[in-house]
Amino acid sequence: MKPLRKERLQQAIKQELSKILLEDMNDERLKFVTITDVELSDDQKYLKVYFSTMPGKNSEQILQSLERVKGYVSGEVARTLRLRFAPEIKFELDNSIERGVRMVKLLEDLEKKDEVKEDESHEDESTDHTEETNEEP
């Protein structure tokens, strides 16, 4: 399959999966799922689906719910997008968003610590300078 066609098909699958999970599923936990990426094999028989969920939601329960509905989801994707095969889906939790949020927080904390150190060093310099000017010759 040509790379551009594959990329377009993966985008269409990602949109369709999101729509199915939001509109067709009765399990409320699946309403909190975001499809972050999909990888379709060249023969279109296998589909790896990466998802994330809101912090505080039980990822393992959500993964189990996704596993229960993957046959239906696969069939709907194949039917809607007119694929030759209903791809075998494998769901994987994508922690990259969580890791990104943690990384941003760490960087912000480091920045705050640097600001505090700079403020302290400026205070020390001004204190040293004040002491020097108050000394008698």
UniProtKB/Swiss-Prot annotation:
One of its GO terms (cellular component) is cytosol. This is Ribosome-binding factor A. Belongs to the RbfA family. The gene is rbfA. Residues 112-137 are annotated as: Disordered. One of several proteins that assist in the late maturation steps of the functional core of the 30S ribosomal subunit. Associates with free 30S ribosomal subunits (but not with 30S subunits that are part of 70S ribosomes or polysomes). Required for efficient processing of 16S rRNA. May interact with the 5'-terminal helix region of 16S rRNA. NCBIfam families: rbfA. Residues 127-137 have a biased composition (Basic and acidic residues). Monomer. Binds 30S ribosomal subunits, but not 50S ribosomal subunits or 70S ribosomes.
